[in-house]
Amino acid sequence: MSKIIGIDLGTTNSAVAVLEGTESKIIANPEGNRTTPSVVSFKNGEIIVGDAAKRQAVTNPDTVISIKSKMGTSEKVSANGKDYTPQEISAMILQYLKGYAEDYLGEKVEKAVITVPAYFNDAQRQATKDAGKIAGLEVERIVNEPTAAALAYGMDKTDKDEKILVFDLGGGTFDVSILELGDGVFDVLATAGDNKLGGDDFDQKIIDYLVEEFKKENGIDLSQDKMALQRLKDAAEKAKKDLSGVTQTQISLPFITAGAAGPLHLEVSLTRAKFDDLTRDLVERTKVPVRRALSDAGLSLSEIDEVILVGGSTRIPAVVEAVKAETGKEPNKSVNPDEVVAMGAAIQGGVITGDVKDVVLLDVTPLSLGIETMGGVFTKLIERNTTIPTSKSQVFSTAADNQPAVDIHVLQGERPMAADNKTLGRFQLTDIPAAPRGIPQIEVTFDIDKNGIVSVKAKDLGTQKEQHIVIKSNDGLSEEEIERMMKDAEANAEADAKRKEEVDLKNEVDQAIFTTEKTIKETEGKGFDTERDAAQAALDELKAAQESGNADDMKAKLEALNEKAQALAVKIYEQAAAAQQAAQGAEGAQSSDSANNDDVVDGEFTEK
């Protein structure tokens, strides 16, 4: 069975891992980094992903960041003169990760396990699956990020029974999961979270502070200047990271804008104490899900054996202190918070292929599922933190006499009224025989698969007629749209490969020209003029082909030059070998003369 890669598709950074033997290994990107910025930019018709895209974010308005926060919505982003869905942008990131994983493995990759925040709803999970499909990946499993982290943490501890709390604060989302580990079983007891809380919010607090300080001093609102705002975003992210290691940092942004008197510069000193003060409310927000998860799991803090920190934002000192204060435990630092989720996803890939034995993952649904009933009430069929996959049925009836059809309004959430929860979909069961209200028996069944994706069916127990739907969010993509996007992604991949081939050829030509010119210059006046002249002629032809830009011509002329340069190199080698032989011969002769004189002794004599 081919390899299944593990992907952590993050808000700010993503990572890809693969199972090698029984070890999960992070695959470095082409720039040598173990995580890749989840950034996509468009320039001159080219799609740029990762570090290169992030570097040009300040100057390129066609740059998309933090697209994960829009997954599962109908919101589109405009770039490159076109509107893109969150699934399309996410697919570009996935395609890039897939590409360099293939380069590392030396084989095609078609299957992946992709992680999502535990608190992602059905629409967001479906959108993630669609993004994988557009990128040319068969998504074998959607795994919750804290669960994947626990899998990576606990793989070498399968003989140990312990309860762990995973505190996962990433770039855009926050999750807390409580798991019980023992005998290779990873059992999620409860999960809670906040999909609108992450490192981006901490950055925004710094940005708002800088905008306010600059406005006080100069009377100019930098939040209205798109380019200045991007520079502020970069500076805020850097300052946040700096303050994890030092207690004060200097934010310097020269020429941030221009005033009546000329260019203006931003210079602000930010202390860790001030940063903690600015972000106090965000840190406070992490405490509620921790308490809720413990309550849902029916555990007290004393029963938790380990606290695992996941996500780059858990490096913020105030966050670490809050975790210590809330749990009464020193967090376990045995895992890399940026890499552990992708590593866990790769392990789950190994479970699917059979390379990892005796590991069972029991995950849960993060939110309750149900339908709208009379009076706009939300009636739950599946409670949150129910182990998945699962199925649950309940019998309902009609609300009016001779009602010919029932509308099934499917919802996800925790609020008592339907209007306050997330609509997953609607469908209708028709042709119900005329009968007084309360008589028809309508059985509604919810199914949640291992990926947390929901399907619902309604069945009239009297006629056995049933209606069935797999929930597709109103904001989701149709099969036709996914198909079109897959074709676009494939076309982009071909175009990218062609561009890479052109760049490789250009580099090869430049290198050949440089090397040959150097050789011709160094061999001037040393003989073998025939070979030198032939190499020079081939060199001139290659330069002309380079000027024309014709790839086929360049390839042919490069081959010809390599042939002539090889002939010249052979002559140089032969001359060098002959010279060395001659030198060795001379040394041998000298040694021989010396040996012949070894027994000769000078003496004096006198005639008598």
UniProtKB/Swiss-Prot annotation:
Residues 576-608 are annotated as: Disordered. The modification Phosphothreonine is found at residue 173. Induction: By stress conditions e.g. heat shock. Keywords: ATP-binding, Chaperone, Nucleotide-binding, Phosphoprotein, Stress response. Residues 576-598 have a biased composition (Low complexity). Gene3D superfamilies: 1.20.1270.10, 3.30.420.40, Actin, Chain A, domain 4 (3.90.640.10), Substrate Binding Domain Of DNAk, Chain A, domain 1 (2.60.34.10). CDD domains: ASKHA_NBD_HSP70_DnaK-like. InterPro entries: ATPase_NBD, Chaperone_DnaK, Heat_shock_70_CS, HSP70_C_sf, HSP70_peptide-bd_sf, Hsp_70_fam. Pfam families: HSP70. Residues 599-608 have a biased composition (Acidic residues). GO terms for molecular function: ATP binding; ATP-dependent protein folding chaperone; unfolded protein binding. Belongs to the heat shock protein 70 family. Acts as a chaperone. This is Chaperone protein DnaK.
